[in-house]
């Protein structure tokens, strides 16, 4: 999929509209984790270095009523961006109208402007009208009219069809490009799904089979092995007739799990032992069991034999995609499976290793292996949608080369 990228554009003197993902946590008017802002800096700096005018659009949180607006202003984000760039950043507290148009008209080459939260457009005169998140055609057209070029660097919203990504891009044919972050996501996730170096192994964790059915099915067609861990394991156990005690199970997904098991044959690798606990708490009594789990006990992590089995499968892999934890990662006594698998990924030589999803990303950070992995995806839902083989509207709307 050859899409226009920022390097294909002549930026000098141009008003460059940029969709970034600055949806960051804000407490008492201060940005908490600024990772997403930092991730967009290479593209922003490239535009400034090439004498473009960078006009940044992002959503922040969800806005369903007027009262939501004051706490979700982009002002603190603009202030943090100013610190990171070490230069002034203009913040415009509105999403449309003369105040915004005048501020853009006054910009000089190499300057940055941050537009107010795009989701302010979701509430008008007290009504929840979803102009931004419903991709109102007039809004996309209006925003597109404010610039000469468009760069989408917000992979995290690529699976959504909003006025600020699809709306703007579809009104700027031939002038909508991917930023560096978006380009990297398309390259690594895209190659993994469509053209992986083999053996290709996927590691899927997390609590619910229902969240991952599409991903499992798509990756069973593409991968050489699919390792399953985390809470969704026990719905597969139930489908195989293994007793699961009080472990998490989705009763209404047991039939789906059976179908997946039939389709998968020996491609699907399940844990062979589990760490079980007598209550859902870090200080629970625990033991390691193989096979059936007794009533009154629940599996909260994969066991030591499973960890070794998974490592054997991963040892020869040339492409690995990891999405989701192997156990209840947020409790230290049930984090071992996730941490050991992550640690092992960091040691693989000559393999492309891709991590997506909040918990897996957090595990990689905790282990200090982020720099040993090839790519850490910035999009949770967007990464999953990509791995499911979905067409992502935000990417589809970017101009082809």
UniProtKB/Swiss-Prot annotation:
Instruction: Give the residue spans that cross the bilayer.
Output: none
Per its UniProt entry, which superkingdom is the organism in?
Bacteria
This enzyme catalyses: (2R)-3-phosphoglycerate + ATP = (2R)-3-phospho-glyceroyl phosphate + ADP
The record's section on Gene3D superfamilies has: Phosphoglycerate kinase, N-terminal domain
Enzyme class label: transferase
The yes or no answer to whether the keyword Nucleus is present is no
Please state the pathway this protein functions in, per its UniProt record.
Carbohydrate degradation; glycolysis; pyruvate from D-glyceraldehyde 3-phosphate: step 2/5
Which parts of the sequence bind substrate? Answer: 21-23, 36, 59-62, 119, 160
The protein's name = Phosphoglycerate kinase
UniProt keyword DNA repair present: no
Q: What keywords sit in the KW lines? A: ATP-binding, Cytoplasm, Glycolysis, Kinase, Nucleotide-binding, Transferase
Location of the protein in the cell: Cytoplasm
Q: Which Pfam families match?
A: PGK (PF00162)
Q: Which GO terms describe its molecular function?
A: ADP binding; ATP binding; phosphoglycerate kinase activity
InterPro entries, alphabetized: Phosphoglycerate_kinase, Phosphoglycerate_kinase_CS, Phosphoglycerate_kinase_N, Phosphoglycerate_kinase_sf
Q: How does it assemble?
A: Monomer.
Provide the family line: Belongs to the phosphoglycerate kinase family.
> For ATP, which residues are the binding ones?
212, 330, 357-360
